[in-house]
């Protein structure tokens, strides 16, 4: 069966039903439907070296979402270092990763399975963070998704979120289910439980059915992305810095926009009920 037809059938099952107006409840409902399909967490089922290319895994449990804006690999690093499109010309990276000398090749695969090769010509760092922005040699193909970020008022849609202080530092406590990739491009799920000084902390999910889809991070996962689900869309939150921790992209939104010379795309939460 054609890959796009299959994805359409799966998406209709997962997203075609009425979902809860509560954002977090809707995420859990969608996770349940996704887990009914498969336990296979691999985005890709195979790859070839000559010509270089990847085959999308039609059995991946998270295949209904659009992962085409996440890099399949980087020449010389494989799946290490991540790379997610935040504009047609820019990718989110991790500053501490020893990326190859510029220019280096980065690869993306669209939903039908075509591999695209670009060159990262320079990398800019966001001062005081582990965020780096790579510039591509040309605009990414329109068939590759550019990811949005959360709106500034996202916290008003998260029930149970609290804001406190510890040693004079603001600490946000919450339970926000997320999806994330590792260096093998496997999709796992966890919960953001704290935001401290512009960093998000991820732990195993409290949602019992999702616990089998959690995997702890390890060295080499750096730069790979973390997303939250907003309806049928993946919204980018950041990229792995160290085990269980990543820079919260919204904290550094202004600095990122200054580097890329444009505004980041913003997701729409207005269809959900505000709880705060």
Where are these regions (language model features)?
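Conserved catalytic-core segment of clan PA serine endopeptidases
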Residues: 31, 99-163, 183-192
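A conserved glycine-rich beta-strand in the N-terminal activation segment of trypsin-fold
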Residues: 59-94, 127, 223
